[in-house]
Amino acid sequence: MKLFPPPKVSRTATGRLDTLAPLPLVVHQGLPRRLRNACTRFAARHEAVFITTRADLPRAIQLKLSGKHPGDEAHSLKITPNGVSITSSSESGLFRGLSTLSQMLRQAKSSIRCCEIKDVPDFANRGVMLDISRCKVPTLTTLKTLIEQFADLKYNQLQLYTEHTFAFTDHETVWRDASPLAASDILELQAHCQAHYIELVPNLNSFGHFERWLRHSEYHAYAECPDGFIHPLSGKPMPHGSTLRPTAASLDLVSRLYDEYLPLFDSKTVNIGGDEPWELGLGYSRRRCEREGKTKVYLDFLNRLQTLAKKKGRRTQFWGDIVLEDPASLTQLSTDATAMIWGYEAGHPFEHQCALMAEANVPFYVCPGTSSWNSLTGRLDNATKNLYEAASAGANHRATGYLVTDWGDHGHHQTLPVSYPGFVLGASASWNAASSVSRSLSQGINLVFLDRQAPALADRIVTMSRFPQLIKTKVVNATVFNHLLFWRMRHAPNWSSRISNVELE
């Protein structure tokens, strides 16, 4: 029997617990209402389990709040022939223990071997970020199902990466035909996350990656380069701007967006983005950047965004790529802002970047990825290394959190199951970085995402995600398969000539 994520300590004992006989779950009056509701869902999911208030039954599932467990989600679980006891100092710890027991019951044929588990996560904050701004916005049904599955994997945060896919009242031009989430949708997701002990953290890019707004003429006045720019990476002309000009008018626009968006969330944190302001210093702010330096101009506007969010009662998270380009700038950051260190390739210098943040006393998360985007089938070898390297570096330098990113670059062509391996691996790496689930990965996918109904499909998902390893030719942040299918046919990419027919066959 495998558990996802694997527990820190698990010891077997003699005897077995019969899982076919009726198994009462004791819900006493002292349990918080949210946990009692979770118990009701637990009983509905497991046929032999039923709810009772009687604490004197000889065989039962008992939940105990005790102050002996360090850490908010630390818990112990003990199984004997007479039942199960789950103990924690917090209701969230009891909920995580129920998640472990649920996985055990779903895998048991008729009984579970007696054992004792003692568990605590490596990272206090363990989240998933879903990209809902690159051509795919999941339905509410899909998002709710994912929330339940993420809770099963013991994630406790969720972010929905948003550029233009929220239905802001005064900005229909931006979100028309984009299937945006409405305010009522966010409230529904907030309630579902809260019920499953997940913090729904608002994520609204507020500086760069604003192209879905700035392409429209009525927003050109906010653009650093309203008539477009030459992309510094590709050298290709971009027809419209992607970065806000760092002005009071831009700040006022963002303030109005925050006023409508942030009150929908219970979280006191907001991810304001800030990554990849490609054309900053090439247009409106060119002279200022020449005088003061681009990093200083960037930091000034970033700090103003953080001050704005603070006035609205929110702490901020921001992508750390720009400040890491100039480590001396780390001393100029707001003390209550959290840097998000992102990198998606195996071998990304998480260790070095985490050390820089730690030395500057900047709170930070590590943010690896599922390696699903630009891939078609996934990149399992890269994802595994990337996710575990981030966890190792983050743990070494006391990162405050771990965020698994699932992007949709260039059209979001990957299907959702391509991301499943990364979700399972990320849960394992962030809860128990010393563990490995690589050999049982398909079992975890089948258990959590396919309800144990499709082991062959789970095997195929894992097999397909290993396809890129068969090709010697490598491309960064993508696969050959993806690039051969989606490329501008007038000009063959340089790397395509390196692929032999033998490799393709």
Name each model feature, range by range:
Residues 91-93, 135, 164-167, 206-209, ...:
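Solvent-exposed loop/turn segments at secondary-structure junctions
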Residues 123-320, 331-332, 338, 394:
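Substrate-binding cleft of carbohydrate-active enzyme catalytic domains
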Residues 1-22, 28-29, 33-36, 148, ...:
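Substrate-binding groove of N-acetylhexosamine-processing glycoside hydrolases
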Residues 50-54, 202, 318, 366:
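A structural preference for short, hydrophobic beta-strand core positions in alpha/beta folds
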Residues 4, 100-123, 151-159, 218, ...:
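Conserved oxyanion/phosphate-binding beta-strand-loop segments in alpha/beta enzyme cores
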Residues 1-126, 389, 412, 449:
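Contiguous, structured surface segment used for ligand recognition
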